[in-house]
Amino acid sequence: MLAIALLVLLCASASANSIQSRSSSYSGEYGGKGGKRFSHSGNQLDGPITAIRIRVNRYYIIGLQVRYGTVWSDYVGGNQGDLEEIFLHPGESVIQVSGKYKSYVKQLIFVTDKGRYLPFGKDSGTSFNAVPLHPNTVLRFISGRSGSAIDAISLHWDTYPSHCNTC
């Protein structure tokens, strides 16, 4: 009898875990095949995305750096080109990223939940449009490959962190 009770409890627990809602999703990888892998997965622990720096030249997205909470990620990519920077308003989040690519990422356009449209780079190449799979989720971190430019980019979505008091 005890064995049956334990079996029922185990099945009920497994069933409850299987119906929990998922919140994370992944978009990408968009771009070429070169470069060295990078990931900001650990940076998301510093808080939500609060600012983005993008270095561009006439042809490509050369480099990028993202601020998570109040901490900037390591810069990835090359050093040539113009550095552009945008800051998100408190509580504002990126909910869509579109762009263009060929062998390198050529354009990135960030769209926020406050209706802002933040474009970087050149409008040429193969188009992509990345949005989260699950409702009420936002861009949490970026990964990809880089060398002298941003070769490829991936976007990672999840719920807005509830633990950031300074963001």
From Swiss-Prot:
Matches recorded under SUPFAM superfamilies: Mannose-binding lectins (SSF51101)
Keyword Lipid metabolism: no
Listed GO CC annotations: collagen-containing extracellular matrix; extracellular space; Golgi lumen; mucus layer; zymogen granule membrane
KW Transport (keyword) present: yes
InterPro entries reported for this sequence: Jacalin-like_lectin_dom, Jacalin-like_lectin_dom_sf, PolyBind_ProtTraffic
Pfam families the UniProt entry points to: Jacalin
Signal peptide (from-to): 1-16
Example GO biological process: defense response to Gram-positive bacterium
Family the UniProt entry places it in: Belongs to the jacalin lectin family.
Tissue and organ expression note: Expressed in pancreas, colon, duodenum, and much less in stomach.
Gene Ontology molecular function: carbohydrate binding; peptidoglycan binding
Keyword annotations: Cytoplasmic vesicle, Extracellular matrix, Golgi apparatus, Lectin, Protein transport, Secreted, Signal, Transport
Record domain Jacalin-type lectin: where: 24-159
Protein name, per record: Zymogen granule membrane protein 16
Organism for this UniProt entry: Rattus norvegicus
Job description of the protein: May play a role in protein trafficking. May act as a linker molecule between the submembranous matrix on the luminal side of zymogen granule membrane (ZGM) and aggregated secretory proteins during granule formation in the TGN.
Taxonomic path: Eukaryota, Metazoa, Chordata, Craniata, Vertebrata
Stored PANTHER family: OS11G0524900 PROTEIN, ZYMOGEN GRANULE MEMBRANE PROTEIN 16
Locations listed in the record: Secreted, Extracellular space, Extracellular matrix; Zymogen granule lumen; Golgi apparatus lumen
Source domain of life: Eukaryota
